[in-house]
């Protein structure tokens, strides 16, 4: 164990040392590194898929659920998507060096801000091997060194991906030590990593509530967490039913295992009888299980062939990550807002309505990272928000909120231009 602890300290030290030349690397160099990464992924597809197959085999043997298994799978198509996302990050404007908020003071000093990298970012994450590439690419583009610590369930995939990333970075003339990967997945080592505040500037955990809570409680380093998503859609009395059905279907079914998938559907009582049987019929085609409150049960028990069970108390406020939806009929917009305030996680909430006043109340009163009107909750995503890939979706209010793109992993320094001024 002592050897493993020393190895982590050395990786952090190397990342810190590499962060300095990386911080002033040219945009062309950083973009070349990202393009190299994309090419390496595609050129080494057979080896990556073989490593991922090992992860799948071990995960199945360990009894991993289908929802969790889907998160770790890499297919040729998904690998091509990861490479495409990396190229998209390369094509984004480089935030480093941006000058903003410049003002001339009465004494003639010109004062403003210059955007700079944070330094070294440690990413602690679970399940998804694409996160290894996404986070490395974003950190490099923003001039940050990165320490990657994935979960044991994707160790084979992450190991080869990290090796290829380091190779691609070095081929672009940047220090490969700017990307560090911790192969030892022992839980106790995370605790040690979280104490290295002299080398690491920010920790980003991505995963379940247990991981995020552990990191927040044990870190000596600032943390920006990609929070869990307990996501609601409220179908207002003035909703367009066709739009509401499409939005509820897409939000639940398109990819149910991700944090921006809908968990709870709130429906105004005046539209429930017309709307619920239609959406339930569509959901039933995809195998969605509905956990309904008493009023929704009465409407749906004879209306469709959907999987229908009474909602339990703990179904409200639950992130299902599966083809399961809690459904509740509410008396008013006020009740919907109160329900979301009590059970929401601050991730994404959406209203479907044609009533402008209701939409504005929802936008103003819901406290979440992303609040939507007449749109699927699945849009809360870095690429959909024009940020490229993301490091996570923060449900915090400091330092970043919502999808975390390039600017969210930079800071700034004050710059001052003088002409011989002295303070009297």
From Swiss-Prot:
HAMAP family: ProA (MF_00412). Pfam families: Aldedh. It is found in: Cytoplasm. Its EC number is 1.2.1.41. It comes from Dehalococcoides mccartyi (strain ATCC BAA-2266 / KCTC 15142 / 195). It catalyses: L-glutamate 5-semialdehyde + phosphate + NADP(+) = L-glutamyl 5-phosphate + NADPH + H(+). This is Gamma-glutamyl phosphate reductase. InterPro entries: Ald_DH/histidinol_DH, Ald_DH_C, Ald_DH_N, Aldehyde_DH_dom, G-glutamylP_reductase_CS, Glu-5-SA_DH, GPR_dom. One of its GO terms (biological process) is L-proline biosynthetic process. Disulfide bonds: none annotated. GO terms for cellular component: cytoplasm. One of its GO terms (molecular function) is glutamate-5-semialdehyde dehydrogenase activity.
């Amino acid at each position: 164990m002592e050897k493993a602890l020393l190895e982590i300290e050395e990786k952090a030290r190397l990342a810190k040392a590499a962060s300095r030349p990386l911080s002033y690397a040219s945009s062309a160099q950083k973009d070349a590194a990202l393009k190299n990464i994309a090419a390496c992924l595609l050129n080494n597809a057979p080896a990556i898929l073989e490593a991922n197959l090992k992860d799948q085999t071990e995960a199945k043997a360990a009894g991993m659920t289908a929802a969790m298994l889907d998160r770790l799978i890499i297919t040729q198509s998904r690998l091509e998507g990861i490479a495409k996302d990396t190229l998209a990050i390369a094509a984004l404007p480089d935030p480093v060096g941006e000058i903003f908020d410049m003002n001339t003071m009465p004494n003639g000093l010109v004062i403003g801000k210059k955007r700079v990298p944070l330094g070294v970012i440690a990413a602690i994450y679970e399940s998804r091997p694409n996160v290894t590439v996404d986070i490395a690419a974003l950190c490099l583009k923003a001039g940050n060194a990165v320490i990657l610590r994935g979960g044991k369930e994707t160790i084979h995939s992450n190991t080869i991906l990290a090796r290829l990333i380091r190779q691609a970075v070095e081929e672009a003339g940047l220090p490969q030590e700017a990307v560090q990967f911790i192969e030892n997945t022992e839980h106790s080592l995370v605790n040690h990593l979280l104490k290295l505040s002299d080398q690491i500037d920010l920790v980003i955990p991505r995963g379940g509530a247990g991981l995020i809570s552990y990191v927040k409680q044990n870190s000596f380093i600032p943390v920006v967490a990609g929070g869990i998503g307990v996501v609601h859609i409220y179908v207002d009395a003035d909703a367009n039913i066709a739009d509401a059905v499409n939005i509820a279907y897409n939000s639940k079914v398109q990819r149910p295992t991700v944090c921006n998938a809908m968990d709870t559907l709130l429906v105004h009582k005046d539209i429930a009888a017309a709307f619920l049987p239609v959406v339930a019929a569509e959901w039933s085609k995809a195998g969605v299980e509905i956990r309904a409150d008493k009023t929704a049960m009465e409407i749906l028990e004879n209306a469709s062939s959907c999987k229908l069970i009474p909602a339990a108390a703990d179904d409200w406020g639950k992130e299902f990550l599966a083809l399961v939806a809690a459904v509740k009929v509410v008396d008013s917009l006020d009740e919907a807002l109160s329900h979301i305030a009590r059970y929401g996680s601050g991730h994404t909430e959406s209203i479907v309505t044609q009533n402008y006043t209701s939409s504005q109340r929802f936008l103003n009163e819901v406290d979440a990272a992303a609040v939507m009107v007449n749109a699927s909750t699945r849009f809360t995503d870095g690429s959909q928000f024009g940020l490229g890939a993301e490091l996570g979706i923060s449900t915090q209010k400091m330092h970043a909120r919502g999808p975390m793109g390039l600017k969210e992993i930079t800071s700034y320094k004050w710059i001052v231009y003088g002409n011989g001024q002295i303070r009297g």
